[in-house]
Amino acid sequence: MAEREHDRIPYSVQVEFRTASSFLVAYSVNLSRGGLFVETDADLPTGVLLSFDLQVPGVGFLHLVGVIAWRRGLDSPDGPPGIGIEFQDLAPQLGSAIDKLVSLFRGVQILVLSGDRQDRTTLARSLKSIISTAEILQAADADAAASLLTSDIDLAVVDLDFDPEGALETLRRAQRLSPKVPTVALTASAQLREYARTAGADELATNPPPFGELQVVLVRALSKPVSVRSTATA
């Protein structure tokens, strides 16, 4: 019966997370509450069943079944396009995997690039207050950031206003890594926001960022999968 029910699921989504830490952030914010938002521009209808395969470093593949509860379109002012997925009781499917990942969790590494010492210190304190286990690495210029920016970094937060060219190059460098490092770009300039998008910034925030806005973009960037693929199965 279970196999026949699985055969009737019309859509399948495969989601690959960059690190175990990325998945744990997504779980703590979304999955533990019974849902998940996945960025995708695929035109999937609401109300249908979805086969959902998660690829997580450290535990391999996890299989879930959910329902597409809502969609956000390309032109929405509320954020990137995607689908909101609702799941039923997740404990049987994820319990042992979460226990294993939590036992191995050693926090996240966040690189902060800002040419202003006071701004850099204030930003580092705000990040620590949002994620207390985070290790904050600080860089005063793009050269220092380049020496610290490796695939071991979980997130780079980049101030564009002090040295725009150096900051944009840092965003591009993060994109070139394999796997790429997610980035949050901070700027008070509308033009620099567009440049940051072109350079590959995953999230944008005003500079200096209000605490609530920083919290939203930080969690969203940390929990963002490296790839999302959707296919029709029927």
What are these regions (language model features)?
Residues 1-31, 96-138, 227-234:
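N-terminal helix initiation/capping motif
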Residues 9-53, 82-84:
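Short strand-loop-strand
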Residues 26, 63-73:
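Short beta-strand-centered aromatic/proline hotspots
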Residues 142-143, 155-178, 189:
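Conserved phosphotransfer microenvironments
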Residues 150-151, 173-180, 199:
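Conserved phosphotransfer cores of two-component systems
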Residues 169, 188-205:
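Alpha4 helix (beta4-alpha4-beta5 surface) of REC/receiver domains from two-component response regulators
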Residues 184-186:
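Hydrophobic/aromatic residues positioned on beta-strands within the core alpha/beta folds
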Residues 209-222:
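C-terminal output helix
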